[in-house]
Amino acid sequence: MIPIFNITFYRPVYHYLVLPGLIGIVTSCNTASTADKNGVDNLSVLTLPKPTTVSPEETARIRNACVLWYDTVLKQKGFNGEILVAKNGNIIFEQYNGTGHLPGTDTISATTSLHIASVSKTFTAMAILKLWQNGKLNIDDEFSKYFPAFNYSGVTIRSLLNHRSGLPNYTHFLENLGWDKTRLVTNEDVLNFLITRKAELIDIAAPNSHFTYCNTNYALLALLIEKITGKKYADFINQTFFIPLQMKNSYVFSLADSAKALPSYNWKGKIEPFGFLDAVYGDKNIYTTVRDLLIWDRALSCNLLFTNETLEQAYAPYSNEKPGTRNYGLGWRMNIYPNGKKIIYHNGWWHGSNASFKRLLNDSATIIVIGNKFTRAIYHTKILASIIDSAYGPVDEEETETQKDLAAIKDPVSKTASVTNKNTVKATEVIAAKSLRQHKKKN
């Protein structure tokens, strides 16, 4: 445990507007890599393929729809952050709004790192799958193989990845069972609490009986990465992903980063204080930018880091008890449509930070929004997917990690979303449909 007192967080850090050229200028996706004895890739800097051309008509169609959605939904609902929409690796639409501190003069720019909350799980999951790909673990191993004191039979690495472990959520049980909130919780504390206080825990389900989204799973997976590699989670993520991919504005938060990490704010603009759960990582605590997340998307899409077999494991649906389009893979949410199309995505929410990272694999398109002043509008990005291709179907509000907790926030978007969103959807779809008809006539 770490005392929460006498820690200074969120000193002002000023970011200046730097807008380099489009990402990806080199031509190969086939850079080979080898792994050391701990499963860590010995990777030099990797190169992304050159983005393929998008027609001027298609670019204009998508951009016009994005501008309308941004102006009438995001910007009007207190958005403070970053948005990027890309097609074939080309940035079609990109906007930065607001300041890192409220009030402040540190304008948010392409180099401003924001907390992506549970979108961090995509990195944790792919780190585990990297170790599996390199032969350092079996994802069907029980977690207790690596932590013998862990007394939950049947909980496998796979069930942690796909949220079918049956474990309770540390974000609830620690406080409910009397954790001293003047002490920061660590990942080790989460594990030890599960082991030593098992008899007092409620809501423990049989492993693999059903899907329950649970941050505990990813706090434990971060410990597993450290156990197998002998490296701190942050170092492994940095060396395996951030450095090779030149994600220069990405980092895993630790207390040493307290001076540079931007704070988050509630929908009224009031700062969210640093809390006793805020030092746990694996489930959250990656800070990055929309441009760095585009690099991450492109590296995954062109098999720069992973084999097809590994990606098939990640993107497979594992919770099929109930019919419907929504499902969860290994670290990824997904919408699967009857026409065969699939949206691979993850949302995030922690305090005032929220994010949406949406990957339309069939259309080589990416939609990324990050903010540090809470607005539910960030979760309405599915409309942009339907603009790129109407086959993605009707628009509804996205899932986030703790829907019950999210419902308790009385932000203006929740009160007016139904009317505003319906009007915006209609207007945006009209513009997009008109542009699409014009494009088809020309071709």
Residue map of PLM features:
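Short, surface-exposed loop or secondary-structure junction motifs
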Residues: 155-351
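Hydrophobic (often cysteine-bearing) scaffold residues that line and stabilize catalytic clefts
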Residues: 62, 66, 116, 120, ...
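Active-site-proximal loop and beta-strand segments within enzyme catalytic domains
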Residues: 46-49, 99-213
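Bacterial N-terminal signal peptides
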Residues: 16-25
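Catalytic loop of the DD-peptidase/beta-lactamase superfamily, centered on the K-T-G motif
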Residues: 29-96, 226, 238, 274-443
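Short, solvent-exposed loop/helix junctions and linker helices
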Residues: 56, 60-64, 113-118, 154, ...
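Hydrophobic membrane-targeting alpha-helices
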Residues: 25-28, 32, 131
